[in-house]
Amino acid sequence: MTDRASILQQIADALRSVEELTGVFDEQAPADQPSPSAVLGAVQELPGRLISDTERKLFVTLHLWSEYQGKVELLRLADAVEQALPFNFCFDDFQLLKDEASGWEHLAMTLRVYCTKG
């Protein structure tokens, strides 16, 4: 287990190690950012598994974006991201969508990890 800031840094570092990604952002990517890219999204914190209440469960949403027309590129990137993450990060779910405004493909992936309270 580790603290919240370290968890987000580990995720960002793992994303940066995925060679296919052209950028990793904490907020929205710039409008001229080449595809594919990643954005760190929402973070939700819930009670952990321990009776002592010294643990927290974090859910972190990652957003992968691609202008490639089709789902294959994002599915491959999701696999690469999972492989790059430390072993204690658990894949929870993902949803693959098409952003109608931009025409880009969008994969929202939720990760689960445990950290120490406070």
Residue ranges of predicted features:
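Charged, amphipathic alpha-helical segments and their flanking helix caps
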Residues: 1-28, 42-118
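Low-complexity, acidic Ser/Thr/Pro/Gly-rich terminal tails and inter-domain linkers that flank the onset
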Residues: 36-42
